[in-house]
Amino acid sequence: MSRIIREAKQTDMPDIMKVMEAAKKIMRSSGNMHQWGEGYPSEAVITSDMEKNGGFVIEDEGRVVGYFAFLPSPEPTYHKIYDGKWLDDELPYHVVHRIASYPDAHHIFSDMIDFCFAHDTNIRIDTHRDNTIMQHNLQKQGFTYCGIIYLASGDERLAYQRIAK
């Protein structure tokens, strides 16, 4: 199988939005009923990722099977963390957002994490409390739970970090 990760292009948008809808179905079927409500992530959000050179697609045999945003610090919602602390609060970091894939696309998360750590050694990710699939994947990939952050909307997220040695 030929899998590549590359920067997303505007022409990928229809495929990216299909991946997002598939990811929402996975969330709902696993009991995560509240993360990624109607209209999120929107095409405008994905376009913003692309404009920051931070939108990436994962392709298998030329088919877009996944998407994620990989953006440099600072992440405004990460300035304050509750009930814990970041592993390191001095070093620059990258944040990963909007991770999505088709259910039949295997090893997407580990491939994405390998890609991210090839570009930075300090990665932060947050997820919804109900997103047990993501929490499991983060722990499996060596991320440490650091505490709680709040989005600009006021919604709570569980915050994780991993620093490569």
Located regions from the model:
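A short beta-loop-alpha structural element at the N-terminal edge
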Residues: 4-19
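Conserved beta-hairpin
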Residues: 53-68
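Conserved acetyl-CoA-binding loop-helix of GNAT-fold acetyltransferases
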Residues: 101-118, 136-140
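A short helix-loop-beta-strand connector motif used in the catalytic cores of GNAT acetyltransferases and
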Residues: 44-57, 74-77
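Conserved acyl-donor/pantetheine-binding loop and adjacent beta-alpha core of acyl/acetyltransferases
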Residues: 69-104
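Conserved GNAT-fold acetyl-CoA-binding loop/helix
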Residues: 25-44
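Conserved GNAT acetyl-CoA-binding A-motif
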Residues: 119-130
